[in-house]
Amino acid sequence: MTILTHTLGFPRVGLRRELKKAQESYWAGNSTREALLAVGRELRARHWEQQKQAGIDLLPVGDFAWYDHVLTTSLLLGNVSARHQNNDGSVDIDTLFRIGRGRAPTGEPAAAAEMTKWFNTNYHYIVPEFSKGQQFRLTWTQLLEEVDEALALGHKIKPVLLGPVTYLWLGKVKGEPFDRLTLLKDILPVYQHVLAELAKRGIEWVQIDEPALVLELPQAWLDAFKPAYDALAGQVKLLLTTYFEGVTPNLDTIIALPVQGLHVDLIHGKDDVAELHQRLPVDWLLSAGLINGRNVWRADLTEKYAQINALVGKRALWVASSCSLLHSPIDLSVETRLDTEVKSWFAFALQKCGELALLRDALNSGETAALEEWSAPIQARRHSRRVHNAAVEKRLAAITAQDSQRENPYEVRAEAQRARFKLPAWPTTTIGSFPQTTEIRGLRLDFKKGNLDANNYHTGIAEHIKQAIIEQERLGLDVLVHGEAERNDMVEYFGEHLDGFVFTQNGWVQSYGSRCVKPPVVIGDISRPAPITVEWAKYAQSLTDKPVKGMLTGPVTILCWSFPREDVTRETIAKQIALALRDEVADLEAAGIGIIQIDEPALREGLPLRRSDWDAYLEWGVEAFRINAAVAKDETQIHTHMCYCEFNDIMDSIAALDADVITIETSRSDMELLESFEAFDYPNEIGPGVYDIHSPNVPSVEWIEALLKKAAQRIPAQRLWVNPDCGLKTRGWPETRAALANMVKAAHNLRQAK
């Protein structure tokens, strides 16, 4: 039984973010649909060939998406809401873009579908919408077309499909309430049709992703798998694919299914390989997810070999990435500025394909010399002086309960803050960033490339900050921000100023749609060598009599949106960051900044996938935030911001953060998220986002007023703030001015209506 390699998916965006550039050019009307489609074809062909050359035996097809693979599945099934449909009922790529972003080059704008995080990753998916009695049919044949492309190129392939039960699990009911699981019988015929078409093309294996099987699912959902897969069986071999956690708790459900193989994540799961082998049907193939698809670290292949070698010859075996390589940058070889030692510790998507090939060859031959050679750098890292800082470790060990307590409770602090700031009812503010214009990006790029000296760079940034203050005063906002012109990314910026991080030139990963991020990498103990944000916050405050918020990214978010170390716990990393940023809060306060926002949009997304593991995570996550914030005096108002959140199941922890003001993303959910705060009787102040910054559509005054009135039915008006859902970095100035003007007008109308 020869062992084969495969990946669960590959990055879509291209080494130079070619897909992003093509999407945005098309959306702006600067290129044709045909040009966009051509870029997609070119990227797919390149990525298949690169994986093949790196040693992958079975190439994934269907992992490419124009916006998001869950959205692609919605179109495949004909699940398009009335507001997004073409007038003639057809489905095309503009339909897809209208669902994802609210508008497209053709068709009428409409509210975008909700977006949320893909399990506990930094990738976002577009939430499917379900209505009672809806019909499904095959309307989008992208998968079949791409299979034809790959076969025409002579590749040995494995199509990828998001499974029907997970697809339903990821969606939400719109309109009349009903159990969306009842739609399973209606979508299965479409899946049967697709599998039949794949069988006609001579496809042997289909990777059918059911990551919901790693969750603690309700029994009704677990029971749904057997009839679903009974209906899908028989046309092709099915590789039931799971990731992000182990499958052992749901293994009884899995082994009853009529599939021919199982993929398990052996990085993030705690499954015992020997137990899996013992319990799986003898004729099943086991796909072992041994190479981490979610990080940038080189694998110790000697450990991976030892983990799986006992199964060689005992059952059909493939070796694979733990999950799709979507979550990893593409190619380490183009990184020319990384220190040689540090670079030797890393492996990006293509290098991970190479790791799989090395592992396959060793398992097939029994020869391990190549594994030992590959693993030597990552083994040597354990003793590197770049990794350990005795002062940081000592400070971390000395943390006491007092370090995470504000001086007085919220009620006392709120009085001091009201006396200091004298804000009106319905105070208006923004979340932090303003549009990152071509001029701002060019300024930063010229400075990084050495084409601009420090003095001219600072002069340029200062001018953009000044303009941001002028714009906000002109609009009539109550609490201002400096606009973050100096920041490329809310995590990368802090990582650049903290010891213990390194950065890549081209380590881009997709966040959503055309948005890509370049996460920093935590390589060692973290400390702050000097103040980070104080200079620009102090300058911005000098330009206005209104309060200007200091803007920090919180410790859990920096952790979650970075590639973390693998040799210490996530708790250790978060608390090291918290101690570093605690010093930043103290310095901002000393510089006269009275409102400090510590963004924690990632707090919820960092939750373990199994609810039984939540308490331990939330305990240290909340403690890290409080360590960061607790140094502030009573009269200093601490804000936090969160997005993409369902709060009802973590309200105790949200309240335990003890932030004076929390701003949250609520507009896409029509203020539904406030139900959690109402039910909990949340005691502090709240800024529910009143418009969706991910869409270029400008909300009307009436729309915003209606949302705020809804909010006031749940939260006392005296504790409500008025703000957008999120930062405005990705928007243009014309739509930003128009939206904020309407937001301020809505707040003024409500003040006058008192």
From Swiss-Prot:
Binding site for Zn(2+): H641, C643, E665, C726
Keyword terms of this UniProt record: Amino-acid biosynthesis, Metal-binding, Methionine biosynthesis, Methyltransferase, Repeat, Transferase, Zinc
Residues annotated to bind L-homocysteine: I431, G432, S433, E484, D599
Reactions this protein catalyses: 5-methyltetrahydropteroyltri-L-glutamate + L-homocysteine = tetrahydropteroyltri-L-glutamate + L-methionine
Cofactor binding comment, as recorded: Binds 1 zinc ion per subunit.
Biological pathway: Amino-acid biosynthesis; L-methionine biosynthesis via de novo pathway; L-methionine from L-homocysteine (MetE route): step 1/1
GO molecular function: 5-methyltetrahydropteroyltriglutamate-homocysteine S-methyltransferase activity; zinc ion binding
Protein EC: 2.1.1.14
Positions that bind 5-methyltetrahydropteroyltri-L-glutamate: R17, E18, L19, K20, K117, R515, C516, W561, E605
Full protein name: 5-methyltetrahydropteroyltriglutamate--homocysteine methyltransferase
Gene: metE
